[in-house]
Amino acid sequence: MNHQSRKADAFDKIRKYDNDLVKYYEIEIIDYEPISAKAYKLVTNANNEYFFKETNDVALEKYQYLANQGISNILYPLENIEKRFITKTTQRSFYINNYIQQIPIREDAKVANMFNELNTLHNQTSMRKTLDPSKSRVKFDELSSQLDYKFRVLEQMVRRVESRPLDIFSMPILENYHTILNAKKELVKLQKRIISSVKARESVNYSFLHNNPSIDHLLNVRGVNYLTSIDNGKTGISSLDMAKFYVKNESYDIDFKSMILNEYYDENHLFYYDYFRYLVLVIYIKRMPVSTEDYINASTFVETSNCITRYFNFSDYKEETRYPNETNNN
């Protein structure tokens, strides 16, 4: 869809909020620019520029919670005339911010800055909780079922490829399948260790997670970095945020090894590091599309295999610490 088509399609949608913007923010739109399906740049009759975003109803609770905690590296929405960050209407909930024009900086620098701000968020909202086997079991059972199904589908696809003469598309699939199987073995090993921690009801830190840690959700305002778009944030274990962050950005020339090592590796308490590694592999496997077209599958296998290979190079810089109940067969 070209720019003009996007703008035309957005016209009716954004105009539905005209009265609400006047009522709750005392601003009148004279122009707008679509940024995404839910976000717009607005220009008012006073020639001021705002960022407008549709959101969910519970976003108010999240922004209010972080504000009450005094978390300073969040870019909070502008308050409406009711002193609320989020405005609920008959259309949808939304919020606005001053539109901040960003100066282009190197992507790898943004990645490093995002890592620092995520750590700040996690550390400042940290609270100790005991791992709950009853809650964790449901999640792991569901995840295990999804992974088992995905590995079965991948195996069936590989067997189908093996039954045919080799060609330029089947070769990459067969050559890289062993890497997928190595990931499966690693997942089994890590899950056993994580479940062991859960059964022991270990005490761990829970934090507020951004839950969508893209570098697009980091803004620099007069030299200070702020996290944005925490609409989908939740309370959880920071390994989840970092796994998502790593998968999105591991291709950049950043020293992820030392960054993750310094933050998560503790030979006396491997839970956070194990959970991070486990989630990285889960993301890689779950996002693999399986197509009826072998050229698509070949590309998928090569890309995923390369990611998993970098993962093993990344994670193997420390010797494995054995749990007491793990036997050494050497």
Where in this protein do the model-derived segments appear?
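Helical subdomain adjoining the active site within ATP-dependent kinase catalytic cores
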Residues: 164-167, 193, 197, 294-330
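Juxta-kinase regulatory segment immediately upstream of eukaryotic protein kinase catalytic domains
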Residues: 1-29
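Active-site acidic catalytic loop and adjacent metal/ATP-binding pocket
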Residues: 39, 77, 189-242
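N-terminal ordered "arm"
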Residues: 24-40, 45-58
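ATP-dependent phospho-/nucleotidyl transfer catalytic cores
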Residues: 134-208, 259, 312-313
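ATP-binding pocket architecture of kinase catalytic cores
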Residues: 44-135
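Active-site activation/catalytic loop segments of kinase-like enzymes and analogous catalytic loops
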Residues: 238-272, 282-313
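A glycine-centered beta->alpha junction motif in the catalytic cores
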Residues: 92-107, 154-163, 284-302
